[in-house]
Structures are given as C-alpha cells and as structure tokens.
Amino acid sequence: MSASLAINFLNHTYENPFMNASGVHCMSTKELDELKDSRAGAFITKSSTTSKREGNPEPRYFSVPLGSINSMGLPNEGFDYYLKYALEYQKNGSTSTPLFFSVAGMSVEENLKMLQKIQDSDFNGITELNLSCPNVPGKPQVAYDFELTKEILTKVFEFFKKPLGVKLPPYFDFAHFDIMAGILNQLPLSYVNCINSIGNGLYINVETESVVVKPKNGFGGIGGEYVKPTALANVRAFYTRLNPTIKIIGTGGIKTGQDAFEHLLCGATMLQVGTELYKEGVSIFDRLERELKELMDKKGYTSIEQFRGKLNSL
C-alpha cells in the first residue's frame, strides 16, 4: 500500500503538508494562482502591510551555496490587494487548495487594524500573524520582546475569533522556548510557524571584497540548508512545550523529502518551503511529494501520523 501524505490541520484534511513560505512566490495574483495550480497542499499570501510597500533597495536577495541571504523589507501590494484575492478565491469555490492569509504590520496598531478587517470580512480561512520579520530597518522583531508579544496577542484575541497562527523567529535558548511557550499556551492560538529566517547574517563576496545585498550594509536573513538544524530544534522545542491543540508549521531548510520527513518527525503538521521554492519554482512540490512518499514507503509508513512527533532520544 502506497504512503498517503494526507494530514489533518485545524479540522481540514489537506492532500499533503506542503505550502509556500510567505514571502516567496506569492507577491502577485499571478504567482498565487501558480501556487494554487501546483501540487502544494495549501498556499499563503505575501505578508501584507496596510499600504503597498516597495521594500528595501536592491540587490536585496542573493542565492548562496547552501541557501540564501535576503533583506527584502516586506515589499507587498498592500492588505486590500490580498484580501480581495482571498475573498474572490473563496467566492469562486476554488478551495480545494486552502489559502492562508499573512499580515505583518509595521506597528502594533497596524496589525490590530488589519486583523479587525479580516475579522469583519467574509474570509473564513486561516490567518498568520508575522511577528518575526528581521529585515525592516529600525523595526525590531516583536517576538523577541516577550512582554510585547503577550500584550499584542492578548489584544488580538479580545476581538479576533477566526483561526490564527503566529510566525516566530528562531530562538536559541531553552529559557526562551519556555517563556514563549508559557505565553502562547494561555491563548486560543491555532498554530505556530517555526521559523522565520535567521536574522542579520552576513555573506561576503571574496572577489569583490564586499557584501552581496545592499540594505543594512549587507546584513540579511539567512535561509535554506544553513538554517535546518535551528528550524528542527525550534519545531521540536515547541512541539514538546505547547498544548496539543496548538499545531506547528515547520519552515526552514526543506530541500528534499528527507528534510520534510525530519520536520514531521520533530512534530510539525504542515511544512512551508521558501529558499528552494525561489530557486526551483512551483515544480518543487511535485518532487518533494514524490521523495517523501518514497522515503515513507521504504520505512513502511502508510501515513504521516504513524511517525509525526515520534523523534527518538538516545
């Protein structure tokens, strides 16, 4: 019997756990439609701000041997552009590939304003609040401020009654895992997304003796294979600390079916792909699906739930 990649996430069955990471191949309606028509199990919009943003000056993205460095600065077409797409997509009944909606306001007030609009709209999908963008000059990552994170999410859940997840930055200390999990466990949160890129890395071109991206004097978020061990650690740390009702999306370093298997083994339910989607395009979902199935067949697993979260310790 061939392996099934079907998973249940927030009371909906998805054909497979793969989706794009917000920020990659989801800026325009054309790119969103390409995701919709791909083998992805779900897809998510670009993280939106209230108004359209051009983002940081170019060059702001650079492919490097084991991944990428970027300092995009949240370029997007604006909240209303993506909400219109989401509502039309929903109205047309094309929900075989579920759509998530991502917001990343430049301030607490902006996030609350956008989430209130989603709450008041007919959108009935899942919303992701990005509290972890590392590439907006002068704007610290909210989720590294634990008290502010608690304050924001407490305010959000006073009025937001639809499914909501949060995208987190990577944490590197057990005390930080404990503190953040303690905050999130008090809230009616649907999921956490671990992780956003590792902020403020630096990559150097030895030939020119210079940095490779322009913003922030070359400092940028690191993605791809470089970040997989950190991503797996965050997925596992939150899986073992959060209430079982709070699901986990694993993001970071997914290039092969084996990478996907490792994220699932650590406890992720769904998986987002960023750097490798940028490099390969939407056909990556066909390959990842095939490779994950082949690995599961080889191990004798017929469903993801047979091994998800069951990482062995020594």
UniProtKB/Swiss-Prot annotation:
Pfam families per UniProt: DHO_dh
SUPFAM superfamilies assigned to the protein according to its UniProt record, in alphabetical order: FMN-linked oxidoreductases
Pathway(s) of this molecule: Pyrimidine metabolism; UMP biosynthesis via de novo pathway
Enzyme Commission code(s) on record: 1.3.98.1
Cofactor annotation: FMN
Protein's UniProt keywords contain Cytoplasm: yes
Cofactor binding summary note: Binds 1 FMN per subunit.
Protein residues bound to FMN: K46, S47, N130, K167, I195, G224, G252, G253, G274, T275
Xref: Gene3D superfamilies: Aldolase class I (3.20.20.70), Dihydroorotate Dehydrogenase A, chain A, domain 2 (2.30.26.10)
Binding site for substrate: K46, N70, S71, M72, G73, L74, N130, N196, S197
GO cellular component terms listed in the entry, alphabetical order: cytoplasm
Main location: cytoplasm
Free-text activity regulation comment from the record: The activity is independent of the presence of oxygen.
Active site: S132 (nucleophile), C133 (nucleophile)
Known catalytic reactions: (S)-dihydroorotate + fumarate = orotate + succinate
Single GO BP term: 'de novo' UMP biosynthetic process
Compartment(s): Cytoplasm
Keyword terms of this UniProt record: Cytoplasm, Flavoprotein, FMN, Oxidoreductase, Pyrimidine biosynthesis
Family: Belongs to the dihydroorotate dehydrogenase family. Type 1 subfamily.
NCBIfam families referenced in this protein's UniProt entry, alphabetically: PRK02506.1
PANTHER family per record: DIHYDROOROTATE DEHYDROGENASE (FUMARATE), DIHYDROOROTATE DEHYDROGENASE (QUINONE), MITOCHONDRIAL-RELATED
Cited function: Catalyzes the conversion of dihydroorotate to orotate with fumarate as the electron acceptor.
Subunit comment: Homodimer.
Note: S.kluyveri has two isoforms of DHODase, a cytoplasmic isoform and a mitochondrial isoform.
Protein's recorded name: Dihydroorotate dehydrogenase (fumarate)
